[in-house]
A protein has these predicted regions:
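Membrane-embedded alpha-helical bundles of multi-pass integral membrane proteins
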Residues: 2-257, 310, 323, 327-361
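Terminal connector regions
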Residues: 458-495
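Long, low-complexity ectodomains and other extracytoplasmic segments of secretory-pathway proteins
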Residues: 346, 367-369, 375-394, 398-399, ...
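Short aromatic-acidic-glycine turn motif
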Residues: 391, 422-435, 480-481
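Short, solvent-exposed loop/turn segments enriched in Ser/Thr/Gly
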Residues: 397-403, 451-453, 466-471
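Intrinsically disordered, low-complexity Pro/Gly/Ser/Thr-rich segments with frequent PxxP/GP/PP motifs
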Residues: 432-461
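Short acidic, flexible loop segments centered on an aromatic residue
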Residues: 412-426
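Cysteine-centered iron-sulfur cluster-binding motifs in ferredoxin-type domains/subunits
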Residues: 111-126, 218-233, 270-317
């Protein structure tokens, strides 16, 4: 029997073994692929999204005199957001909540139908990473050349390639940061100020900050963002079912895999692949994968659904005269059916899961459209003066002071009527408006602004049957007939 000290020594890891809490990072070197359906779809998606990103701020939309004419604008100093004919005020931020709900449910709906198509084709991380890798390939070569270049000692040739890549990355990053700030001020003004040195240091700082994100995340972090930083990859599989379209490997057809011995000269494909699977273990599916995984190991968290492995495998199958689809973008139900020799089944688009997602999206969208169509064109806010709360006047009268704010949300001047209710024989006087002892008063508010008015409400002491009574103020828009009411207190001495 060994002694305790001997057992402890025997259980210790070797002294040269590295112990780590984290997985080692193996840099992915994606192979360049310029052919195939999904590769072309990725290029098309990138072109559309980047064109919209850089060109959308230059679109114009006439909103009238004195209003910004940029179609898409988030005016932070003016506390307003514009999207073509839609204008959102700060108190209407609930529209943003509705849009976020629709976006989330839309992502769930698309995931249930098409898998991680968002990650593979439309996510900004994927789009930018594709662009940065493309630049890297232009300077450093394709996969094998880049691997060899990283292993080579530093030389003028290596330095030149790396420097050219870095300069291009920095210029692209600055272009991305520049595009971002165009959404927050007039595009032509921002462009002029940035390129003539007249912009504020804060604006230059925002451009640099927003340039640093794609430079670091798309240039260096790349697949690490998708695997470790993005929360969507952690729960996306919960939205899949057997009818969701995912990238998968037909193991029943590809196994046993193995490299071809002796080539195919003089033999038919049936003779070459007799007694073995169609997979020739060329590892092209691994080499073109932006995250560096092997799809033959099954569906994985790191698979972003870009389907480049499908294009690569189809090209190999064409070369060897075998049917396409060894790696396919299909549902697991269809794949299981084919493995049993059943006829090709159609993907079920309408399922309880997709129906629920689409129904909730429709309900939220309907509520948003209704609230927008019936949105208020003005708002009312009333504040009671606190010092003093009330004043006792001669003739047994009580006076309370109020500040009212009328928000006119249209471009033209608004004409409003203010009326009192709830306190018998109450009258008012508005500072800056001629007349006293009025039951009603007309107030004008310039377009797209807040009108602030100070008024004094006076009532006989006999009208108060309590220390505090409810006073209702009603504002009527004389142009539209719509009303807004606010109930406050009318204070007095103890009765």
């Amino acid at each position: 029997m060994s002694s305790p000290s001997e057992s402890a020594v025997g259980n210790e890891p070797p002294r040269n073994q590295k112990v780590s809490l984290y997985a080692d990072h193996n840099k992915a070197y994606p192979r360049y692929l310029n052919k195939g359906l999904f590769r072309q779809l990725k290029w098309a998606a990138m072109a559309v999204l980047l064109a919209f990103y850089w060109l959308a701020p230059w679109l114009r939309w006439d909103r009238g005199l004195g209003a910004p004419d940029q179609a898409i604008l988030v005016d932070l100093p003016g506390r307003r957001a514009y999207f073509f004919f839609i204008e959102i005020w700060p108190q209407e931020v609930y529209y943003l909540t509705g849009l976020l709900i629709i976006a989330a449910l839309g992502l769930f709906f698309v995931s249930a139908l098409l898998g991680r198509v968002w990650c593979g084709f439309a996510c900004w991380q994927t789009v930018y990473t594709d662009l940065y890798v493309w630049i890297e390939q232009r300077f450093e070569g394709d996969r094998n050349r880049r691997i060899a270049l990283d292993k080579e000692p530093w030389s003028l040739a290596k330095l030149g390639r790396k420097a050219g890549k870095q300069i291009s990355w920095v210029l692209l990053s600055l272009a991305i940061g520049y595009g971002f700030v165009l959404y927050f001020d007039n595009a032509s003004t921002v462009t002029h100020d940035l390129f003539t040195g007249q912009a504020s240091s804060a604006l230059y700082g925002v451009v640099l900050l927003m340039s640093a994100f794609p430079y670091l995340l798309a240039g260096y972090a790349r697949e690490q963002v998708c695997i470790y930083m993005c929360p969507y990859s952690r729960f996306q599989s919960a939205m899949f079912d057997e009818h969701s379209l995912i990238v998968s490997y037909e193991a029943w057809r590809g196994e046993p895999r193995g490299r071809l011995q002796g080539g195919i000269q003089g033999r038919t494909p049936e003779q070459v692949f007799a007694g073995r699977g169609d997979c020739v273990d060329c590892k092209m599916c691994v080499q073109v994968c932006p995250t560096g995984i092997d799809i033959r190991d099954g569906s994985q968290l790191a698979c972003i659904g870009c389907a480049l492995c499908v294009d690569a495998c189809n090209a190999v199958m064409d070369r060897f005269g075998r049917p396409r689809g060894l790696i396919s973008y299909d549902s697991s139900a269809n794949q299981a059916g084919r493995s049993r020799g059943e006829a090709e089944a159609h993907t079920k688009l309408w399922r309880p899961r997709t129906f629920v997602y689409l129904t909730v999206i429709g309900l939220v969208a309907t509520v948003m459209v209704y609230t927008f169509a019936t949105r208020k064109t003005f708002d009312l806010n009333v504040l009671h003066e606190r010092s003093p709360v009330y004043v006792e006047l001669s003739g047994n009268r009580i006076r309370n002071g109020f500040t009212i704010r009328i928000l006119n949300m249209v471009r033209g001047e608004g004409h409003f009527k203010l009326a009192l209710d709830g306190v018998k024989d109450a009258t008012m006087a508005v500072i800056g408006v001629d007349g006293e002892g009025m039951k009603e008063v007309e107030l004008n508010v310039t377009g797209d602004s807040v009108g602030t008015f100070h008024l004094f409400v006076t009532a006989p002491s006999s009208s108060l049957n309590d220390k505090r009574m409810d006073l209702k103020m009603t504002v009527t828009n004389l142009d539209t007939g719509k009303t807004e009411s606010h109930t406050n207190i009318f204070a007095g001495p103890d009765q």
